Design a protein with these regions (language model features):
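Surface-exposed extracytoplasmic segments
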Residues: 29-252
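N-terminal secretory signal peptides that target proteins for export/translocation
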Residues: 1-10
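A detector of low-complexity, intrinsically disordered, Ser/Thr/Gly/Pro/Ala-rich segments
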Residues: 7, 21-23, 38
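Bacterial N-terminal signal peptides
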Residues: 15-26
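Structured catalytic/translocation cores of nucleotide/phosphate-coupled proteins
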Residues: 3, 26-28
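Hydrophobic alpha-helical segments, especially transmembrane helices
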Residues: 9-13, 31
Length: 252
């Protein structure tokens, strides 16, 4: 059993019940109502722990589910180039699944990385019972990896688990430039958005049709994240019912 010292955890809990059955998987999934990018000074100074979003949605075929954990907000295209920005090999990334309705993880998928740059590799363990339950835990299960290989490569099979880890365009939509004009004390300390005024210069978001998807590049500033994407049979996560809760943690 392996340990990392100086435990620090970022968690994103999916807190509201999705009102639509995910028919492709037969699951009801709990979902988040919020997204956070550089939401504290601590994660802005430690961007590898900045978990921006967690997603769960039907997979590429019936009976499959896709899970996504995005981190390291506001990467520029240059920073997201192959081998430039790496996952932190001192961190434990986890998808946690509650399939009994008690808001505690019943299954986890653990992801760790080794090395950096273009030669970085990934190991995925699970889904399995958690070695330890709770947010402030970074114990890596003492089991063989389910999948392993190089980052920025699709690993696994379409009938079992498939994994991709690497830079991708941030899928979250927000008129971030206007947000920082409304609340300038939340703007980043580096990068193009740091050049916005230090005092409020707007009082509301732009009208529909005029809003700019800054993260998607509509304003000339395309941003990326480091994504961990896992697709697998939904039966591997399901409990006695078809309702699951999914959240993510990043622990040091």
């Amino acid at each position: 059993m392996h340990w990392h010292n100086n435990i620090r955890t970022r968690s994103r809990m999916w807190i509201a019940i999705l009102a639509v059955v995910v028919t492709a998987t037969g699951l009801l999934v709990k979902r988040s109502l919020a997204s956070d990018h550089q939401d504290t000074a601590d994660v802005e100074l430690n961007p590898s722990m900045d978990m921006t979003d967690v997603y769960a949605f039907p997979g590429s075929a019936a009976g499959r589910i896709a899970l996504v954990l995005d981190s390291w907000a506001l990467l520029t295209p240059a920073e997201a180039a192959p081998g430039v920005t790496s996952f932190d090999d001192n961190l434990l990334y986890q998808f946690k699944v509650d399939n009994t309705g008690d808001a505690q993880e019943d299954k986890v998928i653990q992801v760790t990385f080794h090395g950096s740059g273009a030669d970085q590799t990934i190991e995925v363990r699970g889904p399995m019972a958690p070695p330890v339950v709770g947010a402030m835990r970074n114990t890596v299960a003492d089991v063989a990896p389910t999948l392993s290989g190089k980052v920025a490569t699709v690993l696994g099979s379409a009938s079992g688990m498939q994994v991709f880890a690497g830079p991708r365009q941030d899928p979250f939509y927000i008129d971030l430039e206007q947000f920082f004009r409304i609340i300038p004390d939340r703007k980043p300390v580096t990068g193009p958005l740091s050049m916005l005024p230090d005092t409020p210069s707007a009082s509301s978001f732009r009208a529909p049709g005029a809003a700019v998807d800054i993260l998607g590049g509509s304003g000339g500033h395309p941003f990326n994240v480091l994504s961990i994407v896992i697709e697998l049979p939904a039966s591997q996560l399901r409990g006695s019912t078809d309702k699951i809760g999914v959240w993510g943690t990043i622990s040091r």
